[in-house]
Amino acid sequence: MNFHQSVSLLIVCFFGSAFLYAQEEHFSNKESYLFQRNTAVASFFEGEWQASSAHRRQWASVTVPFITSTLYLNKKFHLSNRAVKLHAGLLYIQDQSGDAELTIDNFLAHVGGTYRYLQHQFSANTQFGIVSKQLSDGNLTMPGQFDRETGGFNINLPGGENLESTSLSFFDLNLSLGWQYRWNQKWQVGSGLTVRHLLQSEASFLEENNQIPMGVGVQLFATYFVNHKNRLKPILYDYRRKKSSETLFGVEWEHDLDQYKAFFDRFYLGAYSRQAIGSNTDALILGGGIEFNAFRLGAAYDINLSDLDLASENRGGIEIQLIYTGKIRSLKKIAIPCEHY
């Protein structure tokens, strides 16, 4: 496959999807992945509340970059029954897709709860909100606009597509479940289940009717406590929607540092692979970061290994993530004054 064929394939796969139900946003940092796909599992964090921001930039080596940004907030609420906690939060994702100038805004809220029984934690969550899509077709070219005389695309030629509108919005509903279990001193394991787009809303810029297919995701994760300073965290996240799929698997190494000898508390390094049904590895993901006080700062880089590697020169995308976790407040000891006689 030569360079021009690779670029053409990229255009068909990404820009063409703007007219149907565009490919869902995906993240390389495992925390951002859960914030988007399973807030039930994401609610297992140790703390009172959590806020996160992430920024992803990809395909800059081929065309106008695809940019995805997200803001996330999750807050826990205590009940009289200490085994039960409620949680609620917000998620905003904006995805801007290259030359098609397709902008997707997700405004989502979630509510749910967690229940602790012995060494088990169970969580359930409902996520709902509005998804808005806007398309600017001024810079978009279709296969029918290829001009053989010039060897390029001509926007003045008919594209063969009838746009009904350049903006749309719909209500979205997602459900997620989570389970976590402290098996022994060495192992903690967990799993999650996600069902997305339950309403299968209409979302097409064309005159045709195209429903968003329902998506189902499964998450498997664990923590192996090597010793008091080192942990290994393997994951396997799988998500499938109609004929598309995304499987993310790999492992993260986390190491605690002596707080008196370093300006941060710990660092972590991870390596992951992203694959799809019937294809080889789509991308190799290398990531890492540090934790200091209540902050977790991380970055991940995608090395493109798909059929588009010739056009992209193996450069996929880079993602930056910042998480703040509000710690559990400890009770202050109050000295009760007494009178002296």
Outline where the language-model segments fall:
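Membrane-embedded beta-strand positions of outer-membrane beta-barrel proteins
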Residues: 39, 51-53, 88-90, 111, ...
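Short loop/turn motifs that connect adjacent beta-strands in outer-membrane beta-barrel proteins
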Residues: 41-48, 78-85, 99, 116-122, ...
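Outer-membrane pore/translocation modules
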Residues: 31, 114-225, 234, 330, ...
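Transmembrane beta-strands of outer-membrane beta-barrel pores
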Residues: 55-59, 75-77, 92-96, 128-134, ...
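Cleavable N-terminal export/targeting peptides
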Residues: 1-25, 327-341
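N-terminal, post-signal peptide beta-strand-biased segments of exported outer-membrane/organellar beta-barrel
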Residues: 20-87, 322-324
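Outer membrane beta-barrel transmembrane domains
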Residues: 209-210, 214-341
